[in-house]
């Protein structure tokens, strides 16, 4: 990761906490966290829902749309036309026809599932109900096996396999900064069989 980033002429990062990526950044823009923004959220069942800001971000933190808008203006004088999260969504509706019928008004109370191509479309809770698929049935591709860069040997006879923890999302890059979660699970643990531990 670091080598690729260091090879860049200029690297801008937007994040809510210091991370591995921000350590390489030439410029870091502080980001709003989930409770500090308005907008939409699309989950894995294709449901587009509204999210609402519950508190203002600290200091001079600005939402993503504002950062992009200002960067475009200052780098090449281009106005993206964004004035709010809703204006970004309206721009997306013009580009992504599968979401053209989803407006903030329509998802104020309950989300809609795309595709929803028109304003009178009810959304699509179930896709492919006829059994016919746009591209046919699942497309599988053969890939060649790439062996691991390192294998266990006499000096290092074990493999480390990481897993998930209830208290921390992903690799804890963001959740580790939550005092409450950190108090629940302050350090990692390793499980190993008694025989291997000897």
Task: Go through each PLM region and give its residues.
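Non-catalytic, well-ordered alpha-helical segments in soluble enzyme domains
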Residues: 65-81
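A cross-kingdom feature strongest in bacterial/archaeal respiratory oxidoreductases
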Residues: 1-59, 90-198
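Short catalytic/ligand-gating loop segments at beta-alpha or beta-beta junctions
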Residues: 83-88
